[in-house]
Amino acid sequence: MDAAANQSYLNGYLDSLAGQRQLSAHTISNYARDLRELRAFTQALGEQWEFAAVSHFHIRKFAAQLHARGLSPSSIARKLSAWRGFFEWLAQQTALASNPVEGVKAPKRVKPLPKAMAADDAIHLVASGNPLADAGSSMALCNQAMFELLYSSGLRVSELAGLDLRYTRQDGYESAGWIDLDGAEVTVTGKGSKKRSVPVGGPAIRAIAAWLPQRETLLKADQGEHAAALFLTERGSRMSARVIQLRLKHHAQALGIGSNVHPHMLRHSFASHMLQGSGDLRAVQELLGHASIAATQVYTSLDFQRLAQVYDAAHPRAKKISDK
């Protein structure tokens, strides 16, 4: 198979994309660019290069070279997809025994962690009233209770939205999460249906206590499971994760903190500040409901008393009600 034959196969494959699959000219242009790069890699193997000689090892080497150049995982994945399709087509045209791209994967995408706020900024965010809202309104009191609890306990926004005032089980409904104000503890159901209990700091407890009388005024008859919800909208329905996200965003904007503040930023700030204050990674993983750092998906077994001790010593908002 000479260079002319190789080019003929490339042209034939691109023609098939236009004819049989009816791909757009822009998409075919992208395929052509990726295949030219494959040809360049193959030519570098030696003078007598041919596609039939390309092996699984070569493809892995090509992908590694792309990664070393700084190409993103998504771009490498696109090229591998184009190459895989070409070799599938080539196997139909020739005696190619196997597809050398099969099983080769692009490097995993690195998910950047959300930016953590400085402790002073986080406290300012959750403790300050919204200058654009009435300090005594139901919305203002609900917002402060929610934001304090997000940062105090490092909850996911879905876990916060699912909280009930107390554990409830009736008429086929069972609480996924609830708060124990007397015990200063919140219990939630996290990923993988794993339940965990997390301490709640004094400022969050006080903010929730201030919200509860307003909550009672929003309750309506025949609300079903909404009646158990800890956080309610002005219409008396359970607060959704989306509404919580929007409220936090608008609150941060009103305080001049920024437009990209979101609930997970408070969760990440909780984790960062706990680690900075305690250095106890295993305890923080347990508080967050994460798998171990070794990605074993096994939760670290620490008793709640130990978690509470770490929390009290390390968290900047862990001051007890009695410590006012």
Where are these regions (language model features)?
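Conserved catalytic core of the tyrosine transesterase superfamily
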Residues: 1-324
